[in-house]
């Protein structure tokens, strides 16, 4: 299986993914809320993707997308869902909550996207222990290590198994 990225799209023009995509000659598309709500679905549909991968994308995916791309939208979330999921639970908010609640472990969840924030079918989770002396920054670093290590592998495995 050859995994090929055909488009990198997002609403944050400063996202590192755009620099990386340009380096590899991959098409990019930066969009605003208006285009997201009116034109992005049609544009993505024209690309005929096997999979739509979300990483750091915070806007809710509309039902039009989840019904037309059923089991084709994968997201990574920096917690062990269902804990610390849902609206407002992203980035440092999650890791601060994990620390405040003195969780013994955290991790990542890779899941399918449905109509509800962070409620789609869980495809993969990886846990790490949190030593009591860890600061929020340490937790962030460890979780990002997991994301980098496992997300590409799980994307490839998912594509292999869905064919």
Task: Identify the residue ranges that each predicted region occupies.
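One-carbon transfer enzymes
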Residues: 1-163
């Amino acid at each position: 299986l050859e995994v090929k990225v055909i488009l990198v799209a997002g609403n944050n023009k400063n996202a590192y993914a755009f620099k990386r995509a340009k380096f590899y000659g991959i098409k990019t598309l930066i969009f605003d809320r208006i285009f997201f709500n009116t034109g992005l679905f049609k544009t993505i549909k024209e690309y005929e993707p096997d999979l739509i991968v979300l990483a750091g994308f915070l806007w809710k995916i509309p039902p039009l997308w989840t019904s037309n791309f059923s089991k084709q939208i994968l997201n990574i979330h920096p917690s062990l869902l269902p804990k610390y999921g849902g609206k407002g639970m992203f980035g440092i908010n999650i890791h601060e909550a994990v620390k405040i609640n003195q969780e013994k472990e955290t991790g990542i969840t890779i899941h399918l996207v449905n109509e509800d924030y962070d409620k789609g079918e869980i495809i993969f989770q990886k846990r790490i222990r949190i030593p009591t002396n860890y600061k929020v920054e340490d937790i962030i670093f460890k979780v990002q290590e997991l994301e980098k290590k496992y997300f590409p592998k799980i994307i490839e495995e998912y594509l292999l198994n869905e064919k």
